[in-house]
Amino acid sequence: YLDFEDSSALGNDAAGSNNFTVNNLAAIDQSTDTCTNNFNVMNLADNIAESTFSEGSLKITTSSGNRALNTSSIGVISGKWYWEVKNLSPDGAANDEAFVFGAITKSPNTSGYDGSFAMTAGFGLRGNGKIWNGSGETAGWNSFTTNDIVSIAIDFDNGKAYFATNGSYGNSSNPSTGSNGYSFTVGSEFYRMAVNCMESGKSGVFEINFGGTQTFSISSGNTDGNGYGNFEYAVPTNYFSLNTKNLSEFG
């Protein structure tokens, strides 16, 4: 049988015979998302603005004619969760306000194609280095541009969020110690992770890493405290990748 444990030989037969020839697969295509432990992905059903989904619903390409907001399939209201987004957007110049990565409580369906309106039910880091909550901005965080990786660590137990660009957390914050995070109110509605293109005419391309399947190359290989996930940057202490086993324990 094929156990897919060796990323360099995904067609390897664990019994030692009848190996398969790998075609159009690379080490990055190995996934630890299984029937006994599902990792979070983006939700194809929430796609009013007609974004294109690929790479197992972990790569989002927005339509340049519409503003767009896409959310994840798993929602949470407690626990501490970590994920990463690589911004491949051709329009993703430094200090660009169009792109937002964060979490929301409401479906984008409630506001049609206008993702910026739906973000009033949540918060996220904009490309200009400010946290946007739909009605105002909080400065002091790090901006991001094309090919940058944004780390998002959200503490739903204490209502704090932390954002890093290429491993550097803004606002002198530290999610492991709980210092200088962005404060938000955790209510009774579940939050889902979100990527947002707030301006029509912009082209957003986002690769999302929840830990189970990689859409961009990982050079360092970091797991959470339970040994799950594969991330470019270190998972903060007591934060976890969003999968069903961790969810049953911490969510």
What are these regions (language model features)?
Residues 1-251:
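PRY/SPRY (B30.2) beta-sandwich protein-interaction domains
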